[in-house]
Amino acid sequence: MKLKYFGTDGVRGVANRDLSPELAFRVGRAGGYVLTRHSQRKRPQVLVSRDTRISGEMLENALVAGLLSVGIEVFRLGVVTTPGVAYLVRAQEADAGVMITASHNPIQYNGIKYFGGDGFKLSDELEYEIEQLLDAEEDILPRPSDDGLGTVEDYREGALKYTSFLEQTISTDLDGLKVVIDGANGATSSFIANLFADVNADFIPLHVSPNGLNTNLNCGSTHPADLQKAVVENQADLGIAFDGDGDRCIAVDNEGNLVDGDKIMYICGKSMEANGRLKKDTVVTTVMSNLGMYKALESHGMKSVKTKVGDRYVVEEMLKNGYNLGGEQSGHIIFLDHNTTGDGMLTALQLLQVVKTSGKSLKELAADVVTYPQELVNITVEDKEAALNNQELKNAIAKVEEKMAGDGRILVRPSGTEPLLRIMAEAPTKELVHAYVSQIADVARQVLPGAK
């Protein structure tokens, strides 16, 4: 089923253009109706939050108006993280939650992300149902009046409740750890001081002064250079970086080396496995995780399961087969025993607890994962699906895989949003990986119509 408005993580686009207040109003009406029609309450309850982007309040007001127009009781959380909304929906037993954010994307973008009453992101089927209402020739949704209209109130206590929940996910005092924490000028910025003071970490805040225009700007999990520099200059034990809506976490060791989501999953998974808490001794990853992580997991008696790219698919696999740890190289990491989606601050606390209790440095803990050099080439093609089924391209991939003899891998997949074929290779050396990916890319350009 092809969706027009919803991507892999909600409705997203350039604010006030692709994602206009008018569209936000309609998404509020349609989404609110679909998610609350079976509610037993006279007025179904929906929590609404946003990140720190300048367009957030504009879109929030439009979305809330749409929710009110179908009779919903709206609780505005203010600026709270995406995983904070997911947690509070369950804690407050609300019918749904909405987060207005474009996550790690640049400031001109924004998005609308729904959560069901169970705290999980919506299924493709529910998103399709909402889209059918958005594209209907006539608006057939209810138009209540008088006491049938929705109401709105602020619920700022939600942030405190979420902070308290996070603190309870670890059992170790973090006293003695010196940590630089980059808030990406995003939704975690107002949480960092209270949270990390309460767990007794010696922390140095970085990029925690949002002004509406600086969210993710040369900071946070996608731009860690400032964090790497600050960790070394302050002689900190490690650094932590979040993204704009707080659902990602990456780390930096005491020498300024990046510790990505793969390594964090390995470190936390190994600790959970040692304590008998890693269900089925398995970590769920996407196909983009590095071969070095799989080898490290295997060498320590752990298993892995791969899904397609997108944290929602990781969560689906975890729920389907009873796993409790999974995530992406980008830093979306799901601890399903605690929350229903990737949670940056939760991940940071779990990682810091492992560092503290192990008595080892982050660099030592991450050393088991020897990252294989990786190279990605994008090829523009006319037909992505036909390209994947091209026999000459399949033969070229098979030849390279034969050369690799298990010590490397090739991943060829279509882009989800652009007319591109993505060719990725991993191998023990940069020279080998470049040779492998070039060999396949050359064949793709020769045999695929319109390839360049």
Curated annotation (Swiss-Prot):
PROSITE patterns linked: PGM_PMM (PS00710)
Any one Gene Ontology cellular component term annotated for this protein: cytosol
Keyword Metal-binding on entry: yes
Residue numbers of Phosphoserine PTMs: 103
Cited Gene3D superfamilies: Alpha-D-Glucose-1,6-Bisphosphate, subunit A, domain 3, Alpha-D-phosphohexomutase, C-terminal domain
CDD domains: GlmM
Post-translational modification: Activated by phosphorylation.
Active site: 103
Enzyme Commission number: 5.4.2.10
Cofactor(s), names only, from the UniProt record: Mg(2+)
Textual note on the cofactor: Binds 1 Mg(2+) ion per subunit.
Catalytic activity: alpha-D-glucosamine 1-phosphate = D-glucosamine 6-phosphate
Name of the top EC class for this enzyme: isomerase
GO molecular function: magnesium ion binding; phosphoglucosamine mutase activity; phosphomannomutase activity
Keywords: Isomerase, Magnesium, Metal-binding, Phosphoprotein
GO BP annotations, alphabetical order: carbohydrate metabolic process; peptidoglycan biosynthetic process; UDP-N-acetylglucosamine biosynthetic process
Keyword match Isomerase: yes
InterPro entries in the record: A-D-PHexomutase_a/b/a-I, A-D-PHexomutase_a/b/a-I/II/III, A-D-PHexomutase_a/b/a-II, A-D-PHexomutase_a/b/a-III, A-D-PHexomutase_C, A-D-PHexomutase_C_sf, A-D-PHexomutase_CS, Alpha-D-phosphohexomutase_SF
Binding residues for Mg(2+): 103, 243, 245, 247
Similarity section: Belongs to the phosphohexose mutase family.
The protein's role, per its UniProt record: Catalyzes the conversion of glucosamine-6-phosphate to glucosamine-1-phosphate.
NCBIfam families xref list: glmM, PRK10887.1
Protein name: Phosphoglucosamine mutase
Organism, scientific name: Limosilactobacillus fermentum (strain NBRC 3956 / LMG 18251)
